[in-house]
Amino acid sequence: LGHQSEQAIAAVAVFRTLEGLVIAFFSGFSNAASVLVGKEVGAGRHEIAYERAWRLVYLCSGLIGAACLTLLAIHEPLLHAMGLHGESYRIGTGMLLIYSVAAVIRMGNWVHNDTYRSAGDAAFGSILEIAFMYLLVLPLVYSANYVFHAPFLLIFALCYADEPIRYLIMQRHMYSARWIRPVSAAGLATIEEFREKHGVN
């Protein structure tokens, strides 16, 4: 960021404020989703937890999509009110457009991860996120900025390059049902029946 123009830095400052509002709301949604799923896993009602998980992931994606569309609809007066004009306004608008697409997938990944953790699978999502960050995102962003001197908005978009790939992997893991790993007595009492039904080895 320190190597970007003043206009880009101004746009980032405004964008981070708006992003923070979105994250504040949907992190609460994600926490609620993890409680709703984790409670059922702990009680041994794994089928309910399984069905509830994918419904909550899609509900979150739908809500964040609606929120981003609303943000885009009012972006012009909003960005002007926050002091962006000219080039900084153009960059800020571009960032909102990119984020509106990326956020739907990103928040879906967030809910996936929190749901897996609440069901006893604390490692899968976290390992995936860290691996993609260091093996894909950082090399891409570094190369785009320092080697190819790409436009700022392209560099910004590359920050989300891992999200669609992780989403597909997260979806496959969710439907595999392998993330349901109870530790409570009630959960352990019914887990074998659930695994047999879903073909989990």
Please name every model-derived segment.
Residues F26-S30, Y99-S118, F124-L136, L140, ...:
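Short runs within selected transmembrane alpha-helices of multi-pass transporters and secretion channels
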